[in-house]
Amino acid sequence: MGRKKKKQLKPWCWYCNRDFDDEKILIQHQKAKHFKCHICHKKLYTGPGLAIHCMQVHKETIDAVPNAIPGRTDIELEIYGMEGIPEKDMDERRRLLEQKTQESQKKKQQDDSDEYDDDDSAASTSFQPQPVQPQQGYIPPMAQPGLPPVPGAPGMPPGIPPLMPGVPPLMPGMPPVMPGMPPGMMPMGGMMPPGPGIPPLMPGMPPGMPPPVPRPGIPPMTQAQAVSAPGILNRPPAPTATVPAPQPPVTKPLFPSAGQMGTPVTSSSTASSNSESLSASSKALFPSTAQAQAAVQGPVGTDFKPLNSTPATTTEPPKPTFPAYTQSTASTTSTTNSTAAKPAASITSKPATLTTTSATSKLIHPDEDISLEERRAQLPKYQRNLPRPGQAPIGNPPVGPIGGMMPPQPGIPQQQGMRPPMPPHGQYGGHHQGMPGYLPGAMPPYGQGPPMVPPYQGGPPRPPMGMRPPVMSQGGRY
């Protein structure tokens, strides 16, 4: 085999030492940069061709190739692409390229070695921190278990020594509470054995469970329980000891139905008069209840807003939580009661005021905001029924119930004509007449007035007549 042919050089321009990927591109470059007439901008193929063109066409002589590096401006050299380049220049070019390649290889090797070194160093460093991390990880666990003994018994022994040398069980209970970790440490203190548990409870309970201990006022019980069993019992006793817990629901009905149900019953059971229960229910914080019982005295103070328990006087009517229902212009229509002062600020004649048997409160239904029951009373269904009783107060159902003279105990039979409109007011009157019996019926109406109202209205007055409206109302309503 013959000797290997010399490696072909990458296309490059002899005039400007510029490299190109393809010889065609090189030719285009030469024609545009080096062989272009500066007068007519005609692109020629070689240097001599450019000189001849300028001489013949423009009568000018060109001594050098334009845009060429110094020393390579010879216009007589006929170079076309890679052809025509002097051999010595070609050799020099090869030598330069070889040097460049060698240098690049060396750099690559150095870079590779550097990368390997970096990798090794990184690996070593990564391995080093890993062992360190576990150690650090172990340390925090030790401290954590020490602070909160609960997380793990195994952690306690290591953690306890730093906290306080001494009997592990006893000391851990004390430190958590003492350092001022009541929120987090309380349970842990509770977990501690009875011996340590008792001391921590006394200092710790105030921050952790202040209300239970003072309100029940039974610190000895908590101590005894703590002694009897681990501190775990201590925490439960506090919540259980909170006797007032049941009271809040009674005094503050958060929900209309439940609140009304609970408050009236409890109030009735208590020595407080039915009026108080009415006031409690009336203050149920919801429009449906508030509208009917806007101007009721509120000694119980079921409202979240401050209620003057004893002075339930003229100030009470404006107090109803919902202004829309309490739009009252003090009218002289005061119920016949010694407590006339309270209902003194009753709503205008428009709003129907239903006087209850309790004679301590006045139920008010403003005309502007018609409750669901009132609307239902105005429906044609009930208007049909009205003729039977002999009275057709359909036009003013709200007033009808008021005139309905609920005060007469049963009152319902007397107001047979009024009965249809009564549903809305009957509910409220019902509270006073039969607190236990009517409350359940009345409560649902607030939450779901339509279904409960008809049965309720019909039930008390006359079973036959009352039963029909419920069916009709339910069918029409739903």
UniProtKB/Swiss-Prot annotation:
A single Gene Ontology CC annotation of this entry is: nucleoplasm
Q: Which ranges are annotated Acidic residues under compositional bias?
A: 112-121
For region GLEBS, the annotated ranges are 359-391
Q: Which InterPro entries match?
A: Znf_C2H2_type (IPR013087)
Q: What's in the keyword line of the UniProt record?
A: Cell cycle, Cell division, Centromere, Chromosome, Chromosome partition, Cytoplasm, Cytoskeleton, DNA-binding, Kinetochore, Metal-binding, Microtubule, Mitosis, Nucleus, Repeat, Zinc, Zinc-finger
Report residue spans for region: Disordered: 99-157, 238-276, 300-362, 384-478
In which residue ranges is the amino acid composition biased (Pro residues)? 142-157, 447-467
Q: Name one GO biological process term.
A: regulation of chromosome segregation
Describe, from its UniProt entry, the tissues in which this protein is expressed.
Answer: Ubiquitous.
Microtubule-binding region: annotated span: 1-92
Q: Which cysteines are joined by disulfide bonds?
A: none
Q: Which ranges are annotated Basic and acidic residues under compositional bias?
A: 99-111
Annotated membrane-spanning segments are none
Zinc finger (C2H2-type) in chain: 11-34, 35-58
Ranges of compositional bias, category Low complexity? 267-276, 310-362, 433-446
From the Swiss-Prot or TrEMBL record, state where the protein is found.
Nucleus; Chromosome, Centromere, Kinetochore; Cytoplasm, Cytoskeleton, Spindle
Q: Which PANTHER family match?
A: BUB3-INTERACTING AND GLEBS MOTIF-CONTAINING PROTEIN ZNF207, ZINC FINGER PROTEIN 207
Domain remark text? The GLEBS region mediates interaction with BUB3.
Quaternary structure note: Interacts (via GLEBS region) with BUB3.
State the name under which the record lists this protein.
BUB3-interacting and GLEBS motif-containing protein ZNF207
In which organism is this protein found? Answer: Homo sapiens (Human)
